[in-house]
From Swiss-Prot:
Reaction equations catalysed: Deacetylation of xylans and xylo-oligosaccharides
KW Hydrolase (keyword) present: yes
Region (Ser/Thr-rich linker) location: 305-333
Protein name: Probable acetylxylan esterase A
Region spans: Catalytic: 32-304
Native organism: Neosartorya fischeri (strain ATCC 1020 / DSM 3700 / CBS 544.65 / FGSC A1164 / JCM 1740 / NRRL 181 / WB 181) (Aspergillus fischerianus)
Alphabetical list of SUPFAM superfamilies matching this protein: alpha/beta-Hydrolases
């Protein structure tokens, strides 16, 4: 009998030892607590991964990627945001990435971070998502991303570089994707001009910058909800308008003609502007940096609670017969304001007479 017990113990040991590394990590993740995952796949930037698996895990769970602010950590965002508690209510998994840099801001400045599969922080975070989908049989139609401050910047970048992964995003006091771009390709660089609201452009330019981060992609893009405060002196309020311009440009909405504007929504002194089903902007009067997380509104936007669908739609394609919108002349020559170059650009590279192809950044050149 004793020999049989020893044999059984040895059998169990060998069975556990033969489990794949990924399976072993899942076994070690304790439901209801923040846990680190170290072997989620390729991690080119050395970003840390923490995960919260709720005790009330859905059979086919959704995923929320929650990205911290400068000076923050995964632990700080876990304790300071409502997503873990909401995960218990709705059964989704929360991924908390942690910046590898001193000061723990996110790299939203280097070309690697601003390019699909470019090898930066965005690449590492995307690999966390695909690992979690695989290990937990997650619902790929219910994957979302959110963040505050620097994490909000990265949220915009994730939506631009990996649109195929996310159904929707909420952005709390960030800047548009590419606004912090470093012309010297510096990793984790600060851009004072952008932060102070001095980088101003058109929806067409901003939208082109976002699209160029994943050249050739034509699939659905995440619905975007943008929050910003009117008294923000870290990332000035102009960044709200530029971010809304960017996503209006991506989705083909007329930025200057929103569908509706709602005062005191979702609360007093907040104004919600709706351009279409894929874009809402929420401007908080009297609020600084950052706008507090509105967890229940996030759940509605993500479709876990009543109020919003998680369905994404193809970007709207608009056309014009004039050159004022920056469209191609159709003869291989770009009109005034039209795109004429940038990473991944396959359209005309020559401007109409009287205009010069001017480099805005690595992803976008424009006829000016």
């Amino acid at each position: 009998m004793r020999a049989l017990s020893v044999f059984f113990a040895l059998f169990c040991f060998l069975a556990l030892s033969s489990a794949s590394p990924g399976q072993d990590v899942v076994k070690r993740v304790t439901s209801g607590s923040l846990q680190q995952v170290t072997n989620f796949g390729s991690n080119p930037s050395g970003t840390l991964m923490y995960i919260y698996v709720p005790k009330n895990l859905a059979t086919k769970p959704g995923i929320v990627v929650a990205i911290h602010y400068c000076t923050g950590t995964a632990q700080a965002y876990y304790t300071g945001s409502p997503y873990a508690q909401l995960a218990e209510q709705y059964g989704f998994i929360v991924i908390y990435p942690q910046s590898p840099y001193s000061g723990t801001c996110w790299d939203v400045s280097s070309q690697s971070a601003l390019t699909h599969n470019g090898g930066g922080d965005s690449n590492s975070i995307a690999n966390m998502v695909t690992w979690t989908i695989s290990q937990y049989n997650a619902d790929t139609s219910k994957v979302f991303v959110t963040g505050s401050s620097s994490g909000a910047m990265m949220t915009n970048v994730m939506a631009a570089t990996y649109p195929e992964l996310f159904a929707a995003a909420t952005v709390y006091s960030g800047v548009s994707a590419g606004c912090f771009y470093s012309s010297s390709n510096q990793v984790d660089a600060w851009n004072s001009s952008c932060a102070q609201g001095n980088v101003i452009s058109t929806p067409e330019v901003w939208g082109g910058i976002a699209k160029a981060m994943y050249p050739g992609y034509t699939g659905p893009r995440p619905r975007m909800q943008i929050y910003h405060g009117s008294t923000d002196t870290t990332l000035y309020p102009q960044n709200y308008y530029e971010t809304c311009k960017q996503w209006a440009g991506v989705f083909g909405y007329n930025y200057n003609s929103p569908q509706s504007t709602q005062s005191n929504t979702p609360q007093a002194n907040y104004q919600t502007t709706i351009w279409g089903p894929n874009l809402q902007g929420i401007f908080a009067t009297g609020v600084g940096h950052t706008v507090p997380i509105h967890g229940e509104q996030d759940m509605e936007w993500f479709g876990f609670a009543g109020g919003s669908s998680t369905t994404t739609t193809q970007p709207t394609t608009t056309s014009t017969t004039t050159s004022s919108g920056g469209s191609s002349t159709g003869t291989g020559v770009a009109a005034h304001w039209g795109q004429c170059g940038g990473n991944g650009w396959t359209g005309p590279t020559v401007c109409a007479s009287g205009y010069t192809c001017t480099v805005v950044n690595a992803w976008y050149s424009q006829c000016l």
